Amino acid sequence: MLNLLVLALPLLVSLVHTAPAPGQALERAGIVGGKEAPGHKWPWQVSLRCLDQYWKHFCGGSLIHPQWVLTAAHCFGPEKADPLYIRVQLGEQHLYYQDRLLLVSRIIVHPNYYDEVNGADIALLELEDPVNLSSHVQPVTLPPASETFPKGTRCWVTGWGDVHSGWPLPPPYPLKQVRVPIVENSECDMQYHLGLSTGDNIPIVRDDMLCAGSEGHDSCQGDSGGPLVCRVNGTWLQAGVVSWGEGCALPNRPGIYTRVTHYLDWIHQCIPRES
């Protein structure tokens, strides 16, 4: 990694995670137990790139407005990242084959973010120019604040990350998808306490988080920040942002996502109404 990127992006070490140590909470987001996504099924899917000999994919994201991308704060860390060294790719099915990289003018990390396990793992990227929308490039709809995404709701997570812990996605680097069920927060928190010394009265899964996944079907390391979407009354809504978890697709360890409804006010404050 270039020295300038070490300074600008202190948490890009997540790019080189291998198999996680037991009990270790890690950044997420490859696809385990899934399959290649049909072409342009997810037109809001974003690949974030940093300069490391080439513009290398390091995180996912979602287009939520013609000029704004939603992603995870841990992709950048609590320190201010320099948008000069970040690019965005939209409308791509396979990484690196037809790159048309877009410039980023601003990176906004949530002010309460410290690390992903403590919540507020959410960030916004403002593009230098609005994108031209098409059948291949469309923003995803944000949910209403009242949407709870109840237990058992079947949703989809997408990304270009590891296909198993420590097993990177092989060429031709297709976008992967997997269907995952929503797990109730209280149940997810109970599962994460199993085998840990953390007291049951100390929450692991917080109110601003959302759990989804089952054994053999999950997100994984290498593509954090990507979208978890659920179809509600015929409309795809972004329920979560891929955040963290223990291992990949392990029993009693669902993937943990930033709950988008918890941060709707912050998102709307950051994105000017006239933009």
Swiss-Prot record:
Recite the UniProt keywords alphabetically. Answer: Disulfide bond, Glycoprotein, Hydrolase, Protease, Secreted, Serine protease, Signal, Zymogen
Where would you find this protein in the cell?
Answer: Secreted
Where would one find the signal peptide in this protein? 1-20
Q: Which GO terms describe its molecular function?
A: serine-type endopeptidase activity
- Listed as disulfide-bonded, the cysteine pairs are C59-C75, C155-C230, C188-C211, C220-C248
GO BP term, pick one? proteolysis
Which residues get glycosylated? N132, N233
CDD domains referenced in this protein's UniProt entry, alphabetically: Tryp_SPc
Q: Which protein is depicted? A: Tryptase
What is the scientific name of the source organism? Sus scrofa
The top of its lineage is:
Eukaryota, Metazoa, Chordata, Craniata, Vertebrata
